[in-house]
Amino acid sequence: MSAPARLILVHKQRTSAMIRFLRFPHGIVAPEPLPKLAELMGEGEQVEGEAVVTHPAMLVKNVATMLGLSEDDIALEGGFRAHVDTPEGAAPVYLGSLTAIDPPYDAAECSGARFIAITDARDLPPAELGLLRRAYECVME
């Protein structure tokens, strides 16, 4: 059994290398929040029933549309993939980089979201903090 995929959005400033994550009112994943009982699965942990994997392009398109952005405004980070154990099954989580020079503040604001530094995420649930840590490591590599 597989749960719907989620996407974390990050913006890395090209000139200053400042890293910001897009935080929605419900947390850091889009298009919908993780369930309260969600737990981050270990890296390399086997996911049952994942013989067929859905390509994340539709997820990127849906999130871009939700934010009023173009699909080209979000680039998938190929080096990142995580899974979160939920009551519905394992939910794949991808990392998308916002490609604009500056973060799309207006698009974020229209969605009720805001850009935060990783240090401003201390109040997130443990699963989301773990996802942020892995995403940050991926972006810094």
What are these regions (language model features)?
Residues G68-F80:
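A short coil-to-beta-strand element that immediately follows conserved catalytic motifs
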Residues S2-P4, P33-E45, P103-E141:
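Nudix hydrolase/Nudix homology domain
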Residues S70, T99-I101, V139:
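Solvent-exposed amphipathic alpha-helical surface segments
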Residues Q13-T15, S97-P103, I118-D120:
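Short loop segments at secondary-structure junctions
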Residues P56, V60, P87, P125-L129:
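A structural signal for well-ordered alpha-helical scaffolds and beta->alpha junctions
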Residues G78-A108:
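Active-site-adjacent beta-strand/loop module that shapes the phosphate/pyrophosphate-binding cleft
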Residues S2, Q13-M66, S70:
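Conserved Nudix-box catalytic region and its N-terminal flanking loop in Nudix hydrolases
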